[in-house]
Each structure stands twice: as C-alpha cells, then as structure tokens.
C-alpha cells in the first residue's frame, strides 16, 4: 500500500517526470528507481532517510549526482571507466566499471 501511494504521489506531483517509477523490491524499505534503460537500486531506508545521494521528494538521485548505490558508485558518482568492480576468480577475468553506470557489467571473455 505504501509503495502504491509513493508512486501515485510521485506521478501526481511530478507528472512530467513520468520516466521514473518506484518499484517495491521485496522489503518495505527497499525500492528501485527505474529510468529509461537504467535501474538504480536505492539503499534500505533511502526513501525515508537523509541519504547523501538521494532526493526522495523528486524520486531520483539529487541534482548533479550520478548514482545512489552499486559496485561502480562511490560518493554519488560513477567510478572511472576501467576501475575493477569484481576481481577475477578461477578462470574468469576481472570485471570493470564503464564510467556511465553504477552496475558492474560481467566481462564475457575468459583467459
């Protein structure tokens, strides 16, 4: 019920920001912001806390910030391209940040 109310409030107050929607992700305090071609996971309680990267009123990262959380997000900014976000394990290779996402894309190549 809370999740539906938050979506309605966001869409009613910011009708031209309809490209972002809040989705429940299992726990009442865990939400995801969905942008075109991008999903950013909000940390637990971000919707009702003073998280430094999150603007809960606008339902997205604060102005000038790139991300809220993720393996390629530090201090509200994407990590530089080529930063290792997952070290090699077994016959797998390192995975690297792209510089344009907070996600850690899987390296499809093997040694």
From Swiss-Prot:
Secretion signal, residue range per the UniProt entry: 1-20
Key words of the record: Cell adhesion impairing toxin, Disulfide bond, Hemostasis impairing toxin, Platelet aggregation inhibiting toxin, Secreted, Signal, Toxin
Disulphides: 53-76, 67-73, 72-97, 85-104
Mitochondrion keyword on record: no
Positions of short motif Cell attachment site: 89-91
Tissue expression pattern: Expressed by the venom gland.
Domain Disintegrin, chain residue ranges per copy: 26-111
Family membership noted in the UniProt record: Belongs to the disintegrin family. Dimeric disintegrin subfamily.
Protein name: Disintegrin Eo1 subunit 1
Lineage: Eukaryota, Metazoa, Chordata, Craniata, Vertebrata
């Amino acid at each position: 019920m809370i999740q539906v109310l938050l979506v309605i409030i966001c869409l009613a107050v910011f009708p031209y920001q309809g490209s972002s929607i809040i989705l429940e992700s299992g726990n009442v305090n865990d939400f995801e912001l969905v942008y075109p071609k991008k999903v950013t996971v909000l940390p637990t309680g971000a919707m009702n806390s003073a998280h430094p990267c999150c603007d809960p009123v606008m339902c997205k990262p604060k102005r000038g910030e790139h991300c809220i959380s993720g393996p390629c997000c530090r201090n509200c900014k994407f990590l530089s391209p080529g930063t290792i976000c997952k070290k090699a394990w077994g016959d797998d290779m390192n995975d690297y940040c792209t510089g344009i996402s907070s996600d850690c894309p899987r390296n499809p190549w093997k040694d």
